[in-house]
UniProtKB/Swiss-Prot annotation:
Keyword hit for Transmembrane: yes
Species lineage: Viruses, Varidnaviria, Bamfordvirae, Nucleocytoviricota, Megaviricetes
Species annotation: Invertebrate iridescent virus 6 (IIV-6)
Residue spans crossing the bilayer: 41-61
Listed name of the protein: Uncharacterized protein 140L
Membrane topology qualifier: Single-pass membrane protein
Keyword list, A-Z: Membrane, Transmembrane, Transmembrane helix
Location in or out of the cell: Membrane
Cellular component per GO, a single term: membrane
Length: 64
């Protein structure tokens, strides 16, 4: 597993996250309102969601 394989999807994912941060937070808090008292669980869910976005964006970009 090489970081260069994921570099483009990481860049796209970070840009996507910068533009969608507010609605992403609202989506997670709206789905799991009890997470407001558990920032580490919220952060882990957010990172997991970002990883899924990277994977999906990478799959969409690299369709052959």
């Amino acid at each position: 597993m090489n970081i260069n394989d994921y570099k483009d999807s990481i860049i796209v994912g970070v840009l996507f996250l910068l533009f969608t941060r507010d609605w992403f937070d609202e989506l997670i808090f709206g789905t799991f309102p009890s997470l407001k008292g558990m920032p580490w669980v919220f952060l882990a869910l957010k990172v997991l969601g970002i990883m899924v976005l990277f994977y999906l964006l990478d799959a969409i970009i690299n369709v052959k």
